[in-house]
Structure formats: C-alpha cells, structure tokens
Amino acid sequence: FDAATPSGNGAAALLGLWLGRYYGRNDWELQAEEVAGQVADHLLRAVAGFGTILQVIEFLAAPGRELVIIGPPERRVAFEDAAATRFLPWTAIAPTADADGLPMFEGREPSGDAALAYVCENMMCLMPARTPEELVALLG
C-alpha cells in the first residue's frame, strides 16, 4: 500500500523496470509485471493507495525507449540540453564517453571527438543524430 512513501513492492518493481531497460534484462521487466499482477485486485478497490504500482503499469504499457548519447562529456552537453527540451517520461537516458558497460551501448561507437545520439526502441536504434537539431527531430 502506497501513501506519501512508495511501497516496497512498488519501489522494487519500478527499479526493476528501469534497470531492466538499462541492462536489457527482460526477466526483470517480467518480475515487475508479476508484482503488478499480484496486487491488481486490491488496486481496483483502492486506486489511490497504489500510486507506485500505477507507475509500474504505465511504464509496462509504454514502448521501451532508450536514448544513448555517446562522446566526450563536453561534446554531449548540447545533446543533453536538446533532450531536456522534450518530455520523455519512460525513456532510459544513458550518456557515456565510450561504448562499454551496458547492452544499450553495444555497436554504438563514438565518432572521433564528436558526440552522437541514438534514439532506440527496445534496443533497436535509428541512425544516429549528429546534431542536437537532428536529435530533437528524432524525439518528435
């Protein structure tokens, strides 16, 4: 049951969703879905008491969207600022200097000294944006 503080189940499910997006772990997303299913009957009787679980359900219904901004930190700033002009509630945003560490970085190499931005859905990416203006156009 949620109130001003998220429930343990809700917080764990929401964290599992975010980490699942970052690490490409569908099993974590399935566990979050299972948690939401476990409280579905209670949720229908007391919607106001399950705010975090409602966030989980909305997140599960949203397309899996990722934004990878790759390049030297000083070159990424313009892309990060461009992304900040858009409402991206269920988008995992991952800035990085190199393509190491997370599955969403695989195959997305920096372009020399320049930054690139990849807009992806379920880890499938469009061609990279080479300018902040291109990124804004891709984000819609």
What role is predicted for each listed range?
Residues 1-140:
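Glycan-recognition and catalytic cores of secretory/periplasmic carbohydrate-active enzymes
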